[in-house]
UniProtKB/Swiss-Prot annotation:
Protein name: Fibrillarin-like rRNA/tRNA 2'-O-methyltransferase
Keywords for the protein's UniProt record, in alphabetical order: Methyltransferase, RNA-binding, rRNA processing, Transferase, tRNA processing
NCBIfam families registered for this protein in UniProt: PRK04266.1-2, PRK04266.1-3
Annotated source species: Thermococcus sibiricus (strain DSM 12597 / MM 739)
Broadest EC class assigned to this enzyme: transferase
GO biological process, alphabetically ordered: box C/D sno(s)RNA 3'-end processing; tRNA processing
Role: Involved in pre-rRNA and tRNA processing. Utilizes the methyl donor S-adenosyl-L-methionine to catalyze the site-specific 2'-hydroxyl methylation of ribose moieties in rRNA and tRNA. Site specificity is provided by a guide RNA that base pairs with the substrate. Methylation occurs at a characteristic distance from the sequence involved in base pairing with the guide RNA.
Source organism phylogeny: Archaea, Methanobacteriati, Methanobacteriota, Thermococci, Thermococcales
């Protein structure tokens, strides 16, 4: 086995004995597993295998994402943090100098995040409605990146409204689009184009990448705030 730095800072490539490759993040809290992920040890460091079937961000990276603005020290507004599967890897990447403001609508789901944030002080869990960004104005600072994983028909508007309130000029948005959540009657490609058009009225659209085969009818769109 071997571990190498990935092209994105804070992400690593684990090369297995059979030559297969996985991506991983260096565990910020050694010994902590978050969602049953495999942990590997290499040269005194602990790495958590990042499962693309459980994380849309991992799927995008493995599908050769070109733009990944999350790096050590980044401040992230995470819309739809859920129980923290992907956020835990983002937490590893940004380190103690970075911060995640995690918005979750469901009190039950947010409770599942509590054991994680007790160890990971760079995650701030917030019970809130991502469609109403003014509700958490007292808790969230300006951020470098907004990551949105909210399966709603108004996904694009949610990102735009939160970016107006919290995203720094020159900052990036990353949005996971589930086409069937927006319009089940249209082909996914048509939905993705319509979302891109809506986003382009406020952002510069930087990249769109399919999440197949890990997620059916999903894409990740990366945008930049002028």
């Amino acid at each position: 086995m071997n571990v190498k730095k990935h092209k994105f800072p804070g992400v690593y490539t684990v090369i297995e004995d059979d030559g297969s490759e996985r991506i991983a993040t260096k565990n910020l809290v050694p010994g902590q597993k978050v969602y049953g992920e495999r942990i590997v040890k290499w040269k005194g460091e602990e790495y958590r295998i990042w499962n693309p079937n459980r994380s849309k961000l991992a799927a995008a990276i493995l599908n050769d994402l070109k733009n990944f603005p999350i790096k050590p020290g980044t401040t992230v507004l995470y819309l739809g943090i859920a129980s923290g599967t992907t956020a835990s890897h983002v937490s590893d990447i940004i380190g103690w100098e970075g911060k995640i403001f995690g918005i979750e609508f469901s009190p039950r789901v947010l409770r599942e995040l509590v054991p994680l944030v007790e160890e990971r002080r760079n995650i701030v869990p917030i019970l809130g409605d991502a469609t109403k960004p003014e509700e958490y104005r007292a808790l969230v600072t300006k951020v470098d990146v907004i990551f949105e994983d909210v399966a709603q028909p108004t996904q694009a508007k949610i990102l735009i409204d939160n970016a107006k309130a919290y995203l720094k000029s020159g900052g990036y948005g990353m949005i996971s689009i589930k086409s069937r959540s927006i319009d089940v009657t249209k082909e996914p490609e048509e939905v993705f184009r319509e979302v891109e058009k809506e986003l382009s009225e406020y952002f510069e659209v930087v990249e769109r990448i399919s999440l197949e085969p890990y997620e059916k009818d999903h894409a990740l769109i990366v945008v930049r705030k002028p």
